[in-house]
Swiss-Prot record:
Designated name of the protein: 2-phospho-L-lactate guanylyltransferase
Assembly: Homodimer.
Presence of keyword Nucleus: no
Residues passing through the membrane, by range: none
Gene3D superfamilies hit by this protein: Spore Coat Polysaccharide Biosynthesis Protein SpsA, Chain A (3.90.550.10)
Pathway linked to the protein: Cofactor biosynthesis; coenzyme F420 biosynthesis
Name of the encoding gene: cofC
Gene Ontology biological-process entries: F420-0 metabolic process
InterPro entries the record matches: CofC (IPR002835), Nucleotide-diphossugar_trans (IPR029044)
Keyword set, alphabetical order: GTP-binding, Nucleotide-binding, Nucleotidyltransferase, Transferase
EC number: 2.7.7.68
Catalytic activity as recorded in UniProt: (2S)-2-phospholactate + GTP + H(+) = (2S)-lactyl-2-diphospho-5'-guanosine + diphosphate
Organism name: Methanobrevibacter smithii (strain ATCC 35061 / DSM 861 / OCM 144 / PS)
Keyword DNA repair: no
Length: 224
């Protein structure tokens, strides 16, 4: 049996990151998701036995195959948590643990992911929060809890792990908490994302950032 598999659910490319419209076009948003997925999987593959991309989108699955990743076609009439259940059912009996994370945390390489994964060998449940009370990563045995990804899922996941006596351990990571949804998030990638495919792509789009004082800490603009 393998030690750990990565599970990454990916939504349809053409429906992704609508909050970045009109700052980025549909094609640019699709390309952004591709480079972010590459950044995430390039880091994750160093520390996992297999990475599984689950999606209902054939374009996503074909792109994942081009990155030499394993793929699962999401069942019909599914949603995020049902898709994760499907992926974990596939993993059960094949691997001791799974690490579940989104495709839009391109700064993952700046955290000590090896340390987190190594510690999971002695711990039953590790959770990494996202900004705003969500969850960006869970490491656990397949199907150890029923996932509740969505708004304010962090507390729900911790409570679910407590009910199963899994002694949940929280790992705070600035870089893994940053999932990309807004133009200010793009600015954070410009500031912190040196040596990432995502930052290189944003610079190709002539996206610039400057520090400001106010409710928005970063001013993000596009050059001509």
């Amino acid at each position: 049996m393998d030690d750990i598999y990565g599970i990454i659910p990916v939504s349809k490319f053409k429906e992704c990151k609508t909050r970045l419209s009109p700052f980025l076009s549909e094609e640019e948003r699709e390309n952004l998701l591709k480079v972010m997925l590459k950044d995430v999987t390039d880091t994750l593959r160093k520390y996992t036995d297999k990475i599984i991309i689950i999606s209902a989108d054939e374009d996503v699955l074909n792109y994942a195959k081009s990155l030499n990743l394993s793929v699962l076609k999401e069942n019909d009439n599914s949603n995020l948590n049902k898709a994760l259940k499907q992926a974990m059912e596939y993993c059960k009996g094949k691997t001791k643990k799974v690490i579940i994370m989104p495709s839009d945390i391109p700064l993952i390489g700046k955290t000590n992911l090896k340390m987190v994964i190594d510690s999971s060998k002695q711990l039953d449940f590790i959770i990494i929060p996202s900004k705003g009370g969500g969850t960006n990563t869970i490491i656990m045995k397949p199907l150890a809890i029923r996932t509740k990804f969505g708004d304010f899922s962090y507390k729900e996941h911790v409570n679910a792990a407590d009910r199963k006596n899994l002694n949940p351990q929280v790992h705070d990571s600035l870089f893994m908490a940053l999932d990309v949804n807004t133009t200010e998030d793009l600015g954070e990638i410009i500031v912190h994302g040196e040596n990432t495919e995502t930052r290189r792509y944003l610079k190709e789009l002539k996206i610039n950032v400057e520090s400001v004082h106010g409710s928005e800490r970063l001013k993000v603009t596009r050059g001509s």
